[in-house]
Amino acid sequence: MDPASPVHAIVAEREEDVISIANYIIHENASALAPACYLQDLFVDPAKRGAGVGQALIDWLVGEMKTQSWSTLYWNTRENNYRARGLYDKYTPHSGFLRYVIKNPAT
């Protein structure tokens, strides 16, 4: 990836195999004076779920939020993604916001 890009990724490896990846975006935030971090995607190999791998990647991002002085770390998940929500609820309750998406049919 381009080092100047706001899009970043971290991975978790076990025995040289990638078992988890988190893609995140650092962006300006109109409601705060400091940048925010959007965790765009967190994927854990299904065979490795429940072993703390996803939690380790989120913990790393929380540490970076503090080190880099980001105003916020946030993400979205499906309402019925109960397994992921079990992990996410350990960090914070959901915000109550609904997400609306308009896609460009030309892309």
Can you describe what each PLM-predicted range is?
Residues 55, 67, 79-98, 102-104:
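Conserved active-site alpha-helix within GNAT-family acetyltransferase domains
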Residues 14, 24-31:
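A conserved beta-strand-loop-helix scaffold within acyl/acetyltransferase catalytic domains
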Residues 42-49:
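A short, internal acetyl-CoA/4′-phosphopantetheine-binding micro-motif in the GNAT/acyltransferase core
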Residues 45, 56-72:
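Conserved acyl-CoA
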Residues 12, 50-58:
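Glycine-rich acyl-CoA binding loop
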Residues 8-22, 45:
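Conserved beta-hairpin
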Residues 1-11, 38:
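A short helix-loop-beta-strand connector motif used in the catalytic cores of GNAT acetyltransferases and
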Residues 39, 73-77:
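Conserved hydrophobic beta-strand within the GNAT/NAT acetyltransferase core sheet
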